[in-house]
Amino acid sequence: ALEFLAARWPLVALSNGTADVNVVGLGRFFHASISAHRVGVAKPDPRIFALAAEAAGVPAANVLHVGDDALLDARGAMDAGMHAVWLNRAGVDWTHGGASPSVTVASLAQLCQGLAEG
């Protein structure tokens, strides 16, 4: 899935943890990596999402943020003015008020299939 996505769009890894995409062997797929530990703000703070958009070289309104945490990822991205894909592997209901994410998928493969279709 990462190979499909990285071939088409600049991917930015955005993490509240200290994981390094290069250390885990995924760095080649990412245009940039932003860690809350390094920048001093964490999801769902809109500032970390703004840094991700800046790293990708696009306005927040043109970003499609994909994440598996409904509150930190999906709600955070939407509050930052981005489109959100909620990676909902558990199939739970959206309970975070307001608008729901642009798209909800059960897997990255499902996301890639949807993007490929159009």
How would you name each of these model-derived features?
Residues 3-118:
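Asp-based, Mg2+/Mn2+-dependent phosphohydrolase catalytic module
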